[in-house]
Amino acid sequence: MQQPVNYPCPQIYWVDSSATSPWAPPGSVFSCPSSGPRGPGQRRPPPPPPPPSPLPPPSQPPPLPPLSPLKKKDNIELWLPVIFFMVLVALVGMGLGMYQLFHLQKELAELREFTNHSLRVSSFEKQIANPSTPSETKKPRSVAHLTGNPRSRSIPLEWEDTYGTALISGVKYKKGGLVINEAGLYFVYSKVYFRGQSCNSQPLSHKVYMRNFKYPGDLVLMEEKKLNYCTTGQIWAHSSYLGAVFNLTVADHLYVNISQLSLINFEESKTFFGLYKL
């Protein structure tokens, strides 16, 4: 069915959900309200859309009810034994720690006292086992170092035993020789420095010998002989050194002998004689 389109506004029909009444009952057609005169062919603008419905507020949990004073008191009474037990455990731990510390200090003091007593006993036992007399502890070591003496004019050589670097202890110096006062092992040494303005064919001899009433003659301990030690017509110098260990007895006399007395340089750093007990 064709309807005229020349109407001031579109007609609005009420539509029922019933299948038997597709159209609204008579009188249910809404007419456009008059809004003043309009010209022919003009249409009325559509009505504005309805405002959006406000969103419901977000759901929030209901507030908790306040605790009653009776429940608070019950909670406090429940925690008091726990707190008391924790404090009691801490105090017991501190007491045990202090007891252990005191016990360890006591054991350490006893150990120190025992160690000191053992050391004193050990030292006393050593003194009993190895008694030493004051003479033995204060006894000087046997040693001697004699230097060249320019006043020496005879054989065996004379030595300086007092001045300069000379020293003597535990032995005696007598007429150019060292006299042994205590038997034992000794290191004996001697050095002689020869020099000359011209060369000759005579050999240089340097020896250390010993005298004792047990032997009929001199006993040579060390000796050196040197040949071809210089060149004819030239100044020359030669150093002779002897040293060895010997088992000497009481009253042994040690001497030094050389071949040419006039060729010796008697400086204390170049010509000397000595020994020391091992």
Swiss-Prot record:
THD domain boundaries: 142-278
Extracellular-facing ranges: 100-278
Sequence ranges on the Cytoplasmic membrane side: 1-77
Subcellular location field: Cell membrane; Cytoplasmic vesicle lumen; Lysosome lumen
Residue segments, region Disordered: 26-68, 125-147
Biological process (GO), any one: inflammatory cell apoptotic process
Inducers of expression: By PMA/ionomycin and concanavalin/interleukin-2.
Compositionally biased tracts (Pro residues): 43-68
Main location: membrane
A GO CC term assigned to this protein in UniProt: external side of plasma membrane
Keywords assigned by UniProt, alphabetized: Apoptosis, Cell membrane, Cytokine, Cytoplasmic vesicle, Disulfide bond, Glycoprotein, Lysosome, Membrane, Nucleus, Repressor, Secreted, Signal-anchor, Transcription, Transcription regulation, Transmembrane, Transmembrane helix, Ubl conjugation
Biased composition (Low complexity): 33-42
Marked site positions, Cleavage: 78-79, 126-127
Polar residues compositional bias, start-end: 125-135
UniProt-annotated glycosylation sites, renumbered to this chain: 116, 247, 257
Cited function: Cytokine that binds to TNFRSF6/FAS, a receptor that transduces the apoptotic signal into cells. Involved in cytotoxic T-cell-mediated apoptosis, natural killer cell-mediated apoptosis and in T-cell development. Initiates fratricidal/suicidal activation-induced cell death (AICD) in antigen-activated T-cells contributing to the termination of immune responses. TNFRSF6/FAS-mediated apoptosis also has a role in the induction of peripheral tolerance. Binds to TNFRSF6B/DcR3, a decoy receptor that blocks apoptosis.
Family: Belongs to the tumor necrosis factor family.
Subunit description: Homotrimer. Interacts with ARHGAP9, BAIAP2L1, BTK, CACNB3, CACNB4, CRK, DLG2, DNMBP, DOCK4, EPS8L3, FGR, FYB1, FYN, HCK, ITK, ITSN2, KALRN, LYN, MACC1, MIA, MPP4, MYO15A, NCF1, NCK1, NCK2, NCKIPSD, OSTF1, PIK3R1, PSTPIP1, RIMBP3C, SAMSN1, SH3GL3, SH3PXD2B, SH3PXD2A, SH3RF2, SKAP2, SNX33, SNX9, SORBS3, SPTA1, SRC, SRGAP1, SRGAP2, SRGAP3, TEC, TJP3 and YES1.
PANTHER family (alphabetical): TUMOR NECROSIS FACTOR FAMILY MEMBER (PTHR11471), TUMOR NECROSIS FACTOR LIGAND SUPERFAMILY MEMBER 6 (PTHR11471:SF33)
Protein name, per record: Tumor necrosis factor ligand superfamily member 6
